[in-house]
Amino acid sequence: MSAEPELIQSPLSQTITRDGHSLQVDIYRLEEEIDWLLEVVNEEGTSRVWDDRFATDQAALDAAHEAIDEEGIAAFLN
């Protein structure tokens, strides 16, 4: 029986606060995978996970910032 793969959390994962609201940006991958996943979680625990995979954790973080800048933080609060 094989062990489940370890989840690798990027050191770039962070909390972003704007307009009095905080979003947790989680960037992670499975240890045997190359590409990174992006998830943004609001204060209520609701999350948005990107369908796209990212070649680097920096690319994932850039995508999170871009989405927040373009859509506004309110788009993540629902």
What feature does the model see in each segment?
Residues I16, G20, F54, Q58, ...:
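Solvent-exposed, flexible loop/coil residues
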Residues M1-I34:
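Short N-terminal "domain-start" leader segments
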Residues Y28-R48:
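Short aromatic-glycine-(Arg/Gly/Cys) micro-motifs in beta-strand/loop hairpins
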Residues I34-W36, T56-A67:
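Short, surface-exposed linear segments at secondary-structure transitions and domain or protein termini
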Residues E6, Y28, V41, R53-F54:
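Intrinsically disordered, low-complexity regions of eukaryotic proteins
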Residues G45-A59:
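A short, exposed loop/beta-hairpin motif centered on an aromatic-Gly-Thr core
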Residues E66-N78:
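Short arginine-rich
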